[in-house]
Amino acid sequence: MTIGLVYAMPGEIETLLTDETRTPIRTEAGVSFYQIRPHTIACCCGVSKVNAAMGAQLLISLYHPDLVLNAGVAGCFENVPIGTIVLAEGFVQHDVDTTAIGDPVGLVSTVNQIRFPTADLPAAKAAMDATGVPYRTGWVATGDWFATDTPRSHWIADTFHPLLCEMEGCAVAQVCLRNGVKFMAIKSVSDCLFEHHDFAFNSPAAMKDLNRVVMAFLTQLTKE
């Protein structure tokens, strides 16, 4: 199985890289690709939906992965410890709004979907269980907006009922759907939206164990 990993920020991918893998094997359109291990390629694409979609499509077109996994940090709508690991059940895009022409909010008309579930959730949960790492499962809201404790955050929570909010995941999910590639995601909580946590201060703590969990998860998922 060939696996592709999509990260947004250098800080998210940093702990995945070693002296042997730190040099990109190629860079296309500003997206750097790294050979993490045999049959595992990672890319760092930049923050936001367009960057995430571009990185995911390049990854798929260049390396033809069987599975794409998006990993990174996210804000949480619940008050949970920083660094809590979340296995995503699926994604929505909170900033897609064509209600003016009669569509339900969040509808991506190209694929006629609001909700983008991740692939093989029972197998993913079994793999995560086998790592022994405590984790949550939940839905994730994606949009080109850094979430804070504002009326919009409350609207997202009330409308889509997600556990997390971030800026890339659903874009990757949509690209995978259109390419017929399986998609999964693992997130680490960097801040709690209604608790006024400092994202910049907490991000290193959120990223600290993320890639240890990602690699343990993939090892379990790909066991024969």
Question: At which residue positions do the language-model features occur?
Answer:
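His/Asp/Glu-rich mid-to-C-terminal helical/loop segments that flank catalytic regions of hydrolases
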Residues: 193-224
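Active-site-proximal beta-strand elements of phosphoester/diester hydrolases
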Residues: 41-47, 139-141, 186
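A C-terminal functional module that forms or caps the active site or interfaces directly
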Residues: 146-194
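Mid-sequence, gly/pro-rich, charge-dense loop/helix-turn segments that line enzyme active sites
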Residues: 74-160
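Proline-aspartate-enriched helix->loop->beta-strand connector
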Residues: 64-69
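Short, well-ordered amphipathic alpha-helical segments that serve as non-catalytic structural scaffolds
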Residues: 55, 59, 122-124, 207-217
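N-terminal short beta-loop-beta anion/metal-coordinating cradle
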Residues: 1-63
